[in-house]
Each structure stands twice: as structure tokens, then as C-alpha cells.
Curated annotation (Swiss-Prot):
Provenance organism: Strongylocentrotus purpuratus
Modified residues (Methionine (R)-sulfoxide): M45, M48
PTM text: Oxidation of Met-45 and Met-48 by MICALs (MICAL1, MICAL2 or MICAL3) to form methionine sulfoxide promotes actin filament depolymerization. MICAL1 and MICAL2 produce the (R)-S-oxide form. The (R)-S-oxide form is reverted by MSRB1 and MSRB2, which promotes actin repolymerization. Monomethylation at Lys-85 (K85me1) regulates actin-myosin interaction and actomyosin-dependent processes. Demethylation by ALKBH4 is required for maintaining actomyosin dynamics supporting normal cleavage furrow ingression during cytokinesis and cell migration.
Name this polypeptide is given: Actin, cytoskeletal 2A
Signal sequence extent: none
Taxonomic lineage: Eukaryota, Metazoa, Echinodermata, Eleutherozoa, Echinozoa
Length: 376
């Protein structure tokens, strides 16, 4: 490769998973949990070369002896030291690149505090010496990945959900709605309702087991009341799950009660509107002339939209809210778990995007606040 043709790095820092790879690729090279684990017990084996912290998959596999922490909560970085560890791990261990040689595209949830992206910018330039960087809004990238420039994206990951209406490539900031209800809340809720069944899950390691149960067995009910009756009258909906110690647990109506909280946040004691209403409210904040285009291009993105039947339920709920003659189309791409990353890969490899990067020189002249001027 000659100097001017260095591949950009695309890093989608989710609250739950980091997706990282090279611009122009069709899928991320590295996908690992955004966790940093620290030993719960003092090491007794002298000379074992025990580390004081573990990142990602290694932390996940040693979770029995570690306390696991997620440095990103609700899409906002709450622990910058741990975040640096995750980025360091991403560049040096997963992608095996020198970050000072590649421009890097990072992603962020909309309506994040300004300080969050300033600090991201500062760390990239000062700690990792990046030659250039850019911060893109996650939902906009998902829309690019679906091959559209107009539509409304409902993006729900592990830490935060948001609806972003986009018209001809521009996000409409006044109509963006954010919902701090996502995968991690559903995991916590599933822990709670499984405890009511008599199974106890309390530690950070056990939470990871529940997350796995959620990902493997949960689904969205098309009609919640009806499903509850079915579950009460027969055992057809029951599934069993084997815990790491060989114990087998049975899970019934919890399979759809947990994801139902997306549509009925009251289950979690939250007063916000469900995801279908949030989508509708977001569309209603837009100009009356473009609503038709948004209804017909509603794109789902993120891991928490991966539940079976989620798209059908969304279609049903939004149809009930929208005007009767409106054509409503919910688009649920099969790769939507990674569509933010894929959109980033597309964006960073466009020739027209190359002048959009914030260069090291610009950063040195203006400081971290440049990110608000250059990145929308």
C-alpha cells in the first residue's frame, strides 16, 4: 500500500459490544464485549504473570474470578481509563495495527453530552496519536448501510435506544428522540423475573449468563395478552437452558415478558413511551410533507431489535398509531446487529468523505472543540 492509500479504521463502540475493522470491508474483523474485568481475589500463584485487568473475550472467559465492568453506560463513557484500555486492546491485540498510521472513524449515540465526544477526540489524538479522526452518529450509519438516504432509524443496542429521522442524508435534530432503555435493562429485568421463579442470579458473571439466555431464548410476542394466556394454559412455550455447572433451568413466559418491556417500559418502572410510540412521536415532530417517506422507510438497527417477531410487532403497533391509509414498511436487515459498523465502513471509504476527516494539524490548532464544528 502506498502512503496515501492507508485503510481507515472503523470502531463502533457500543455499550455492550465493540465492533472494529477496516473501512471497505463488508463485516467487522473484531467483535468483542465492551468489558474490563479486574480480579476479585488476591493472586496466590506467584509468578503466574497475572494481569491487573482483562479486556473483552478474555475477561468474559475468566469471568468467574473477575468483577466485570462496562465503561460505557447508556451510550456515554463513564470510565475513561477503562475506555482507553478497550481502545488499546482494539488497536494492538484485535486489529494489530499501529493507530498512529491510520485515520479512525468512531461512532456515538445522538444527544450525547458534548464533553463525551471532545474527550474521545482528545484521547485519539493525544494518547494514540491518530493522524485523523471523525465521530459519526450511529443511526445515520445504519441508514447508509441499508442503502437509503431518507428514512427513520430505530436503533437499539445494549445501552441506549434512539429514533432518528433522516431526510436526504441529514438527521433532523429537533425530531431525534432518545430512550435510555435497551438490552442491558432487559437483561436486568430478566434477572429479576427469573429470581421470582426461584433461580438466583446476582453477580456480574451471572448477569452474563442471563444475557446469553436472553439472546438465545427470548422473543417478542405479537399479541402480549394472548401469549400470556397460551403460556398459562400449556407448556408449549417452555424451553430449557443448561447453566455452565450442568444445572438445567426452565423458562416459560419470561421468554417474551422480558423483551415486552421495549413496548411497555412500565414493566421496568419507567414512565417513558414504548419504542413504537417513540418512533411515532419522532415522525410527528417532522414536517408533514416528509412523514410519508419516513413511515415507508422505517429501518431497525442494533442488537436489541434482533428478537424474533420484533419487526412484525413494530409494524402492527405503528400501523395502529398512524393514519389509516398510510403505507408502513418496517425494514429489518438480517445483518442489523452490525449495520452501524457497515455504514461506517461505507462512509469512511467514500472518496467524497476524505475531506471530512479532522486532521491532527486541525486538532493542534483548535483543540478538542473542533469535533463539534467538523462532525455533525
Amino acid at each position: 500500500m502506498c502512503d496515501d492509500d492507508v485503510a481507515a479504521l472503523v470502531v463502533d463502540n457500543g455499550s455492550g459490544m465493540v465492533k472494529a475493522g477496516f473501512a471497505g470491508d463488508d463485516a467487522p474483523r473484531a467483535v468483542f464485549p465492551s468489558i474490563v474485568g479486574r480480579p476479585r481475589h488476591q493472586g496466590v500463584m506467584v509468578g503466574m504473570g497475572q494481569k491487573d485487568s482483562y479486556v473483552g473475550d478474555e475477561a468474559q472467559s475468566k469471568r468467574g474470578i473477575l468483577t466485570l465492568k462496562y465503561p460505557i453506560e447508556h451510550g456515554i463513557v463513564t470510565n475513561w481509563d477503562d475506555m482507553e484500555k478497550i481502545w488499546h486492546h482494539t488497536f494492538y491485540n484485535e486489529l494489530r495495527v499501529a493507530p498512529e498510521e491510520h485515520p479512525v472513524l468512531l461512532t456515538e449515540a445522538p444527544l450525547n453530552p458534548k464533553a463525551n465526544r471532545e474527550k474521545m477526540t482528545q484521547i485519539m489524538f493525544e494518547t494514540f496519536n491518530s493522524p485523523a479522526m471523525y465521530v459519526a452518529i450511529q443511526a445515520v450509519l445504519s441508514l447508509y448501510a441499508s442503502g437509503r438516504t431518507t428514512g427513520i432509524v430505530f436503533d437499539s443496542g445494549d445501552g441506549v435506544s434512539h429514533t432518528v429521522p433522516i431526510y436526504e442524508g441529514y438527521a433532523l435534530p429537533h425530531a431525534i428522540l432518545r430512550l435510555d432503555l435497551a438490552g442491558r435493562d432487559l437483561t436486568d429485568y430478566l434477572m429479576k423475573i427469573l429470581t421470582e421463579r426461584g433461580y438466583s442470579f446476582t453477580t456480574t458473571a451471572e448477569r452474563e449468563i442471563v444475557r446469553d439466555i436472553k439472546e438465545k431464548l427470548c422473543y417478542v410476542a405479537l399479541d402480549f395478552e394472548q401469549e400470556m394466556q397460551t403460556a398459562a394454559s400449556s407448556s408449549s412455550l417452555e424451553k430449557s437452558y443448561e447453566l455452565p455447572d450442568g444445572q438445567v433451568i426452565t423458562i416459560g413466559n419470561e421468554r417474551f415478558r422480558a423483551p415486552e418491556a421495549l413496548f411497555q417500559p412500565a414493566f421496568l418502572g419507567m414512565e417513558s413511551a414504548g419504542i413504537h410510540e417513540t418512533c411515532y412521536n419522532s415522525i410527528m415532530k417532522c414536517d408533514v410533507d416528509i412523514r410519508k417517506d419516513l413511515y415507508a422507510n422505517s429501518v431497525l438497527s442494533g442488537g436489541s431489535t434482533m428478537y424474533p417477531i420484533a419487526a412484525d410487532r413494530m409494524q402492527k403497533e405503528i400501523t395502529a398509531l398512524a393514519p389509516p391509509t398510510m403505507k408502513i414498511k418496517i425494514i429489518a436487515p438480517p445483518e442489523r446487529k452490525y449495520s452501524v459498523w457497515i455504514g461506517g465502513s461505507i462512509l469512511a471509504s467514500l472518496s467524497t468523505f476524505q475531506q471530512m476527516w479532522i486532521s491532527k494539524q486541525e486538532y493542534d490548532e483548535s483543540g478538542p472543540s473542533i469535533v463539534h464544528r467538523k462532525c455533525f
